């Protein structure tokens, strides 16, 4: 009989009645404690990005338990070519909007490039703004071993931290957009990074563009939840950029993106129909007019 490796062994799925995060009975604001408890139950959960109150409200009503106000807003919302130009002021404004648009989801605010790299004190100042001014329930920052001290101080100060290792978009100028953790040395470094952020007190860690087998090993090794994006099916949670997932981004999508709708076409068709009605004089009709 062929034996399955630990990475291939099917993991038990909780019964629907044991769900707490998605499809569960939590009708209050979800907390970090709820997230860590989900790993203990073996409950998987979804996370989506959000950058504005209206979109966030739709996802909140749909039961999405965690939303990331990512610095991916730079590409998807603000018109930048990368995430690097995004400022802390912009992240604070966007995070506050998402918090206002939700009542249940845990909102995680991204610390943008240049807001924590100088050291723990700068990281604390920046994270405090997101918590105090925007009202987020946690912050996210990139880096493994190199961000250990920042994470440690934030957690000691009462600010929950979601770490982010593997492909870290803020380092695109030095790393490029490529799979991380291939090869023995790179895999061992990623494992060290994962353990470092856990030891520093992070409550979860994003694994981006990491070989599925390595992501599975990290997930088995850590006691904190792993959140995959391009990291295979065995992480504790999954995250996608909402404009990719709903087909608004356009162009060629990364291999790991599953497109669940084609909003770009829906919106484009609607805009054209509206324009034709205006030009043709059929809008506004009598039922759209005040008398």
Swiss-Prot record:
Q: Where is the composition biased (Polar residues)?
A: 1-10
Pathway listed for it is: Cofactor biosynthesis; (R)-pantothenate biosynthesis; (R)-pantoate from 3-methyl-2-oxobutanoate: step 1/2
A single GO CC term for this protein reads: cytoplasm
Output the Gene Ontology terms for molecular function. Answer: 3-methyl-2-oxobutanoate hydroxymethyltransferase activity; magnesium ion binding
Per its UniProt record, what Gene3D superfamilies does this chain match? Answer: Phosphoenolpyruvate-binding domains
Residues that bind 3-methyl-2-oxobutanoate:
71-72, 110, 140
For this chain's record, the cofactor binding note is: Binds 1 Mg(2+) ion per subunit.
- Report keywords, A-Z: Cytoplasm, Magnesium, Metal-binding, Pantothenate biosynthesis, Transferase
State the needed cofactors, names only.
Answer: Mg(2+)
Query: A Gene Ontology biological process annotation?
Result: pantothenate biosynthetic process
User: Positions of the region Disordered?
Assistant: 1-20
Q: Where in the cell is it found?
A: Cytoplasm
Question: Record-annotated residues binding Mg(2+)?
Answer: 71, 110, 142
EC number assigned by the record: 2.1.2.11
Q: Which Pfam family would be a valid example here?
A: Pantoate_transf
Tell me the subunit arrangement. Answer: Homodecamer; pentamer of dimers.
The similarity annotation says:
Belongs to the PanB family.
Q: Which PANTHER family match?
A: 3-METHYL-2-OXOBUTANOATE HYDROXYMETHYLTRANSFERASE
The free-text function statement in the UniProt record for this protein reads:
Catalyzes the reversible reaction in which hydroxymethyl group from 5,10-methylenetetrahydrofolate is transferred onto alpha-ketoisovalerate to form ketopantoate.
Q: What is this protein called?
A: 3-methyl-2-oxobutanoate hydroxymethyltransferase
Q: Which organism is it from?
A: Streptomyces coelicolor (strain ATCC BAA-471 / A3(2) / M145)
């Amino acid at each position: 009989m062929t034996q399955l490796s630990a990475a291939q062994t099917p993991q038990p799925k909780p019964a629907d009645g044991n769900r707490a995060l998605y499809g569960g009975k939590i009708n209050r604001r979800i907390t970090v404690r709820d997230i860590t408890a989900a790993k203990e139950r073996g409950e998987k959960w979804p996370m989506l990005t959000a950058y504005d109150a209206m979109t966030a409200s739709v996802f909140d009503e749909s039961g999405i338990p965690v939303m990331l106000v990512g610095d991916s807003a730079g590409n998807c919302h603000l018109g930048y070519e990368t995430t690097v130009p995004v400022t802390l002021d912009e992240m604070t404004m966007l995070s506050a909007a998402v918090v206002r648009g939700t009542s249940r989801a845990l909102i995680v605010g991204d610390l943008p490039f240049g807001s924590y790299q100088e050291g723990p004190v700068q990281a604390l100042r920046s994270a405090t703004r997101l918590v105090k001014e925007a009202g987020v329930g946690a912050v996210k920052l990139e880096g493994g071993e190199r961000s250990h001290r920042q994470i440690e101080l934030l957690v000691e100060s009462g600010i929950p931290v979601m770490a982010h290792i593997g492909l870290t978009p803020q380092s695109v100028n030095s790393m490029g957009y490529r799979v991380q953790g291939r090869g023995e040395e790179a895999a061992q470094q990623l494992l060290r990074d994962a353990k470092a952020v856990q030891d520093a007190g992070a409550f979860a860690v994003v694994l981006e563009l990491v070989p599925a087998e390595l992501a599975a090993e990290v997930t088995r090794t850590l006691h904190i939840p792993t959140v995959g994006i391009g990291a295979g099916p065995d992480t504790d949670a999954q995250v996608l950029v909402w404009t990719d997932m709903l087909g608004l981004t356009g162009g060629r999508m990364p291999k790991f993106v599953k497109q669940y709708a084609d909003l770009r076409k829906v919106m484009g068709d609607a805009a054209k129909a509206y324009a034709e009605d205006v030009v043709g004089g059929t809008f506004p009709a009598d039922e759209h007019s005040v008398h």
